[in-house]
Regions:
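Charged low-complexity interaction tracts in eukaryotic proteins
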Residues: 202-228
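Long, low-complexity, charged/polar intrinsically disordered regions in eukaryotic proteins
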Residues: 86-165
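Positively charged, polyanion-binding regions of nucleic-acid-associated proteins
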Residues: 157-177, 209
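Short metal-binding segments enriched for Cys and/or His
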Residues: 34-68
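A short acidic, leucine-rich amphipathic alpha-helix
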Residues: 182-186
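Short cysteine-rich clusters marking metal-coordination/redox-active sites
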Residues: 8-11, 30-33
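Residues immediately within or flanking Cys/His clusters that coordinate Zn2+
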Residues: 5, 25-27
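Short, positively charged loop/turn segments that connect secondary-structure elements
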Residues: 188-204
Length: 228
């Protein structure tokens, strides 16, 4: 269905192609820009967690430069596509991967350890709507959102994790305008995620500056910011 009905969110090519079934964590490819996509589908709502494959494979994947972008599909009892979300690969960091308990010794694959993707932990900027309530989104808007999301790409996985965590804190503030002092209120949450860092406030300021340079927020002066 995806190959026949969905355009490439990166370059706008009208269709993407199926890949052979034996390709690990890869289901589709754009023949124009070469982008690789994985599809996970679920009847009903996605919820807060997405069941994924082997934990070790997932951790290798998010550290790879060739990891695929992820399509998440919700479908109805009669197999109608309800919603389709794209999560760009730049939003995958270790913090959103939950390790499951190994299978018991009596299981067919004893000791195998799977994982979950913590969907609720992904910032909203990393959930690009392609279909909502069976209505296809504007192609140009989808491409623009992907291009902006790509700005969050960093060479360091640790740096990316920090950037996404601070962005999530920005998103959690209900108002469009916010202050540095409001951001400091999330200090304990960030400290719990980054236990080895002992200068959280400085890190918040640093990541806010990066988010400003990348066009996600605007600095208004005197410790005041505005979401863009």
């Amino acid at each position: 269905w995806v190959a026949y009905n969905i355009f490439c969110p990166i370059c706008g090519n009208a269709h993407i192609s199926n890949l052979p079934n034996n390709m690990p964590v890869s289901d589709f490819k754009c023949d124009v820009c070469g982008a690789i996509y994985e599809l996970k589908s679920k009847k009903g709502r996605i919820g807060n967690k997405i069941v994924a494959g082997a934990y070790a494979t997932m951790m290798e994947r998010i550290t790879s430069e060739n990891s695929p972008d992820l399509f998440l599909m919700e479908y109805s009892d009669d197999l109608q596509v309800l919603n389709l979300i794209l999560v760009p690969r730049y939003f995958f960091v270790p913090a959103i991967i939950e390790k499951r308990k190994p299978l018991s010794e009596t299981a067919h694959r004893a000791g195998w350890t799977g994982c979950n993707i913590l969907y609720s932990e992904i910032p909203e900027q990393g959930k690009i709507t392609i279909i909502k309530d069976q209505i296809l989104a504007d192609q140009q808007l989808v491409m623009e959102k992907y291009a902006k999301a790509k700005e969050l790409q960093t060479g360091s996985l640790e740096s990316r994790g920090w950037l996404l965590d601070v962005l999530s804190c920005v998103n959690a503030i209900p108002t469009t305008d916010f202050s540095l002092q409001e951001m400091y209120q999330y200090k304990d949450i960030l400290q719990a995620k980054h236990k080895d860092n002992h200068n959280i406030e400085a890190k918040i300021r640093q990541k806010l500056q990066i988010l400003r340079k990348k066009g996600f927020i605007q600095f208004l002066g005197r410790g005041q910011y505005r979401k863009i």
